[in-house]
Every structure is written in C-alpha cells, then in structure tokens.
Amino acid sequence: MTITNIDLNKENTIISIKTIKLHDSNRNTDAILKVTAPMDWNNAPVILFAHGFGSSLDGYGPLADFWARHGFVVIRPTFLDSRTVNLDSDDPRQPYIWKHRVQDMKLILDQLDTIEDYLPGDHYHLDRSKIATAGHSFGGQTAGNLLGLQVLDLNTQKREDLSDSRVKGGILIATAGEGGDNLTEFAKENFSFLNPSFSNMSKPALVIAGDQDHNPLTVQGPEWMMEPYHLSPGPKSLLTLYGAEHSLGGIAGYEVKETTDENPERVRLIQEVTWAYFRHLLDIEHDSWKQVQSSLANKDNAMGYIESKE
C-alpha cells in the first residue's frame, strides 16, 4: 500500500557502480560519479542528481535507490565542494564552485557514451530523450541552472544562461531562494553564489520545501525555500511538507548525522511523489502524478499539500 495510493511499477533488483571517472582538461582533476540502475533494463530514463554542499556521490541513497528500483538510472557526481575532495580554501576555483558544479553536470551529459561503457553487459542503454535532473539544498540550485535559473556574478554584475536543452525538467528540494538582503551577513561573506534569479527558469519543475526549514543563511523563514516556485514561471508544482526541516525526514542518506527530523513516512512520501513526477515529466505515464496531486490537494492533509501553476 502506498501513501499516495499510486500503483508503483514492479520493483527491480539494482546495481551501483563506482567510481566512474570522466576526464575534463579544464577541471584539473577527473570528475567522479556513481551510477545506480535497475539490474534488468534497456533504454532507461535518466536522473542526474546534484548533492548538497559538502556531500558526495554516496549521499541520498533513500532517493537514488528508490528511483532505480522503480525504473530510473540515477547518476550522482561528487562536486569540488565535497568534504571528500577537501579543496583548499584559497583554491582559485572556490569563488566559482557553483559554476564548476554545473560544468560537471554538463560533462556527464556530454559523456553518456563513456558512462554506458562502464556498465556490465551489452544491453544497457540510456534514453537520451528522457533526461531529468534533481538536487537537494545547494544541489537544487545546481539542478536549477540546467532549467534556466541564473546566478548573479558579483564581480561582473551579470547573469549567465547555463540551461541545457537535453534536460526536460527537474525537482528542486529544499533549495535556497533569492539572495541580496535575504541573506545573513555570514552568507553574504561566505556564499556569494547564493544570488539566484528564477525569472528565466521556464522548464517544468517540482519544488519541495519543509515548513520548518529555518535556514541559518537567510533572514527569512521557511518561505525562502518556496521562492523557486513562487518566483519562477510555470509550469511548476510545489510540495509543502508539514513539520519538515532541511533534511526532510532523512533523504540525505541512511542514518546520517545531519538529519534533524527523522521521519521514514515523510521520506516514503517524497519517494512516491518524486517518482510520479518524473514519470509525468518524461512522458512515461501521467496517471500516477494525477493521483499524487489528488491525494495531496487538501491543505488539511496530515503530511503536506501540492499546489501547481501553468
């Protein structure tokens, strides 16, 4: 029985392959990533996932494993801000760490053939026509860049379009809103890249936010995490989760220390909602998403609610 009353497809045995290395002469070091996929599949849809600040390819198992068990190939890179990379604070790449993340995502899209070569057997094929993205926290901004989100460069006072036509849309989870006066002094001094604009983020997206996500980087409250929905053009949907803090019940990993609001039922809800949305977004089928919207249409629902705009 599912929380949202959707009919999940057959659960697959999954495989995970790491560490896959992609060479990029502009990066100084190889990009590394992990692929989690159904054991028995061909021509599968792809989810390109961006981890939060400091995390790595080993994070977010509760999401990646679920998506893979139910038909998606999930690709998780490790970005330069990861604690496992331990980039020096004076490294010249630090001020543009946000942009290096986006470049890594595009590198993966450029080298899908190489990734396929790492997979066992001859039958594995990635469906290039069905690619979506997702990210949590800082990773939501990274995913959003592929959808049209633009970051203000404080040195040039310009914004750059880094959207990618290969990506159909995505999911932004607990993602920061606009910067400027919304930021604390600490955030202004240490995270200058938290200056996104959502006005050009025109691709379809689902935004997920917790109504108890009090982020220390902003002078606003949890509504800051809802700005990617409210300040962007449609089509968009917003899932507001009651009682959820930044880890939204435990999506960042199994038994991870950073989870402050452990709630397996909430994680299960997010798994179901995101799976249904990806199926809708990539035109696999639409009944599951319609059922999710119906189940969470009432604000009196115990766990949260969904609203949408076109």
Task: Give the positions of each predicted feature.
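The feature captures the conserved acid-bearing segment of alpha/beta-hydrolase catalytic domains
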Residues: 158-240
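Cap/lid segment of the alpha/beta-hydrolase catalytic domain
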Residues: 80-100, 252-254
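Short glycine-enriched nucleophile-adjacent loop
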Residues: 113, 140-153
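Short beta-strand element of the alpha/beta-hydrolase
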Residues: 43-52
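Alpha/beta-hydrolase active-site loop
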Residues: 94-128
